[in-house]
Each structure stands twice: as structure tokens, then as C-alpha cells.
């Protein structure tokens, strides 16, 4: 794997801005069949990541109860409005409300070996690729690296078969 990240990455990835409505971002992930995307500011620099893991609460079907059951006791909420605000904050209405603000980035000129090591060490599935000005220029996934490994293997074995 002597290639650089720039040679393998997906250039110009789909991105979202922090104020993007969450519903729009979810539809984008689903329609493009991707599991996550970088969140960028107006200058194109990464400020977060939105992944399907961040969105898992959607499947929970959280509702606003008037009370909470705890150890067979009923506890009535003294301030349902505050609970409602906290619930909406937790569920989020924009990308900024649910995104992960820690961005895993790698430089476009870094090696694939470094990228693979980062993904392994951090236990992540994708890296946001940035240029020298820290602007998002691509995305690199585990799948991209595995495909490159398979391609390199095929090219190395082909001369042996001839």
C-alpha cells in the first residue's frame, strides 16, 4: 500500500452544514446509501461527522411521557415543558444537535498505511480527507482500502499466471 490517500479516496464527498435540517440529512444518507458524512462550516472545514450511529435514536420512537415509572413508583414530571425542551435537545432538530464533533481527519498526501492504522486504532469506518488548508476534499472508507488491497493483489498475481 504505497499509494496516497488522494489516489484512493472518494473526492468531493457529500457534506452537510451544522444548520442542515436533520430530516434532510437523514434523507441524504438514505438516498445515497452512505453511512455517514462530514459536517463542514461555510469555509469547507470539517466541524463534525454525522453517522448512522448518531441517528440510531430515530428507531427508538421516543415519546413525551407525563410521568416516569421507576421501581414500580410513578413519578410525575414537575416541569413537562423543561422535559420537552431537553427531549428535543437530545433528539435534535439540526445536524449540529446530533453530530459527533470529534472529526477523524487525514491529509490527502498521507499514506494508505497510515490511514489503515488510524482506522484500526480508532475503530472507525471512515476518515475525512483534508487538504493543506484543512478543507474537506474527500472521504476514505475501510471499503476503499480493502478494494485497493484486492486490486494490488490481483495485479501482483497476474504476472505469475502468465
Explain the meaning of each model-derived region.
Residues 120-121, 125-128, 132, 145:
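Extended hydrophobic
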Residues 1-34, 39-42, 46-47, 72-118, ...:
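Bateman/CBS regulatory modules and CBS-like beta-alpha motifs in cytosolic regions of diverse proteins
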Residues 48-51, 56, 125, 138-145:
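Short hydrophobic beta-strand motif reused across regulatory alpha/beta modules
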Residues 56-71, 145-160:
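A short, polar/charged loop-to-alpha-helix boundary motif
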Residues 104, 120-124, 151:
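Alpha-helix capping at helix-to-loop junctions
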Amino acid at each position: 500500500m504505497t499509494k496516497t490517500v488522494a489516489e484512493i479516496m472518494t473526492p468531493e464527498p457529500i457534506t452537510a452544514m451544522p444548520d442542515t435540517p436533520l430530516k434532510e440529512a437523514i434523507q441524504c444518507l438514505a438516498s445515497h446509501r452512505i453511512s455517514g458524512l462530514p459536517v463542514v462550516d461555510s469555509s469547507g472545514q470539517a466541524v463534525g461527522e454525522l453517522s448512522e450511529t448518531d441517528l440510531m435514536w430515530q428507531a427508538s420512537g421516543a415519546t413525551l411521557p407525563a410521568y416516569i415509572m421507576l421501581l414500580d413508583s410513578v413519578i410525575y414530571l414537575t416541569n413537562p415543558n423543561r422535559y420537552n425542551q431537553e427531549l428535543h435537545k437530545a433528539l435534535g432538530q439540526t445536524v449540529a444537535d446530533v453530530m459527533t464533533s470529534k472529526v477523524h481527519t487525514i491529509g490527502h498526501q498521507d499514506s494508505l498505511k497510515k490511514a489503515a492504522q488510524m482506522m484500526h486504532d480508532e475503530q472507525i469506518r471512515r476518515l475525512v480527507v483534508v487538504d493543506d488548508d484543512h478543507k474537506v476534499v474527500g472521504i476514505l472508507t475501510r471499503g476503499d482500502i480493502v478494494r485497493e488491497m484486492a486490486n494490488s493483489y490481483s495485479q501482483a498475481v497476474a504476472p505469475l499466471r502468465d
